[in-house]
Amino acid sequence: MYCAKLILLLGCFWISSSASDPADPLLVDLPNGKLRGRDNGNYYSYESLPYAEPPVGDLRFEAPQPYKQQWTDTFDATQPPVLCMQWDQFIQGDDKLAGNEDCLTVSVYKPKNSSRNSFPVVAQIHGGAFMFGGASQNGHENFMREGNLILVKISYRLGPLGFVSTGDADLSGNFGLKDQRLALLWIKQNIASFGGEPENILVIGHSAGGGSVHLQVLREDFSKLAKAAISFSGNALDPWVVQQGGRGRAFELGRIVGCGQASDSVTLKKCLKSKPASEIVSAVRNFLVFAYVPFTPFGPVVESPDAPEAFISQHPVDIIKSGKFAQVPWAVTYTTEDGGYNAALLLEKQASSGRELIVDLNDRWFDWAPYLLFYRDSMTTIKDMDDYSRKLRQEYLGDRRFSVESYWDLQRLFTDVLFKNSTEISLDLHRKHGKSPVYAFVYDNPANTGIGQGLAKRTDINFGTVHGDDYFLIFENIVREPQLRSDEEIISRNFLKMLNDFVLSENGTLAFGTCVFQDNVGSSKLQLLSITRNGCENLELESFP
């Protein structure tokens, strides 16, 4: 049904070669009317363009509806996108509420480049654990300096507003993923009006954005929306992406906000629709065991097969094994110390005791580990959960205690369980069951400051190459210093050329600098590109290092 609807919508393309006025490039004509953007020196921006009706009132907890309003006046596209309502880990203090429920927009950034009439397109899905973040969380000055690509940033519903689910057809969940998909359809239909090439669209994302990109790829009709995709440090098999236990969390959410009498999904949904969005989102604090743990209490789920417009109704592993996913070139990545998110927060010194949280793990490991590493709802019994916790501790720390001195072993555990292992599994499954090229790289080149220092609130620890150290060379982020080192400047330009060449490649070839990625499909071994400050190297492996 969803696929049929997509084909119908794609059949109604509204593409006009004269949609942008050559005499006034800030003025763009869309089916909804005219809009005016901003001149930023070396690029134009057209921000906060609605692609869906506001998901409020009766449209809360429903699949997004295409935006149909007509503008009688010229739409002001100079306003930066608002955050979707969220409980933001990176806001200091107890009140972490931010954003607005009416937030479903895309923002378009077009180079000033008189040497070409049209541009390939990169669509970005932001990260933030499916709980926070936004289209404006990453900058785009590095990206736009090359002048070769149009960038489109997507906003989508987050946290309980985007992902609460009772596991049945009545409150199916995955609303944020459905938002992303409708935004991709909007881009396909409208980007030509901005000078974009609808036949050359690359979709990328980092962390939860990377997991989102992979989930989009796992829909067969994604091939009608994009030409290729890259998932940076996040994929559909990461244990924090698609989780179990959603129904219990949905009814617990209802109890917290005053829907305690709801005994079925229909009643719960009706009650939740009547509550202020701020109350629903603020209830996230009740699902956190300590600090911002677990970092994804609400995220993607496997929907009931009878759910209307279900996004996925099988586990990603089963979808990949079936071969019924989009056959487009896809790359998946990780960094050598990706687990710095969220392990680094355990090194923050507590105001009350003056000691680091990591010390408390010695007494709380069996309580906290299932939430830190996302196996609380996947284990059948408490004994299974405790046995796994014990196994992990023994494997990575042996008989040593948790301390600042043993932090790197804990961070290695986080990297393996939350990122690296599932990246290898995804790659292995795709090479066995896919037809289009599938690539992978590992990045090892620590930033001077990054997300590790931000979470730990200290600069005396070496965290290695943590979550985002590669992606933030493409899109600036406040967790690191804006000035790039000379080696990072080279890598940044190589990344941008990699994106440009990938989206234009007719056979799905991917290259970085002097290295051409090796395709994993049909390969007897894993093909992994290693990227460091000294260059790049193709590795052929039995398993990831």
Curated annotation (Swiss-Prot):
Q: Which InterPro entries match?
A: AB_hydrolase_fold (IPR029058), CarbesteraseB (IPR002018), Carboxylesterase_B_AS (IPR019826), Carboxylesterase_B_CS (IPR019819)
- Which residues belong to the signal peptide in this entry? 1-19
Is Metal-binding one of the keywords? no
Task: Name the active site residues.
Answer: 207, 467
Tell me which Pfam families the record gives.
Answer: COesterase
One of the entry's Gene Ontology molecular-function terms is: carboxylesterase activity
Summarize tissue expression. Answer: Eye and hemolymph.
What does altering residue 532 to S do?
A: In strain: JR-341
Catalysed transformations (reactions): a carboxylic ester + H2O = an alcohol + a carboxylate + H(+)
Q: Which GO terms describe its cellular component?
A: extracellular region
Task: Tell me the outcome of changing residue 326 to S.
Answer: In strain: GB-329 and JR-32
Q: Quote the EC number.
A: 3.1.1.1
Q: Where in the cell is it found?
A: Secreted
The record's comment on protein family reads: Belongs to the type-B carboxylesterase/lipase family.
Quaternary structure (record): Homodimer.
- Annotated PANTHER family: CARBOXYLIC ESTER HYDROLASE (PTHR43142:SF1)
The entry's protein name is: Esterase-5B
Organism this protein belongs to:
Drosophila pseudoobscura pseudoobscura
The UniProt gene name for this protein comes to Est-5B
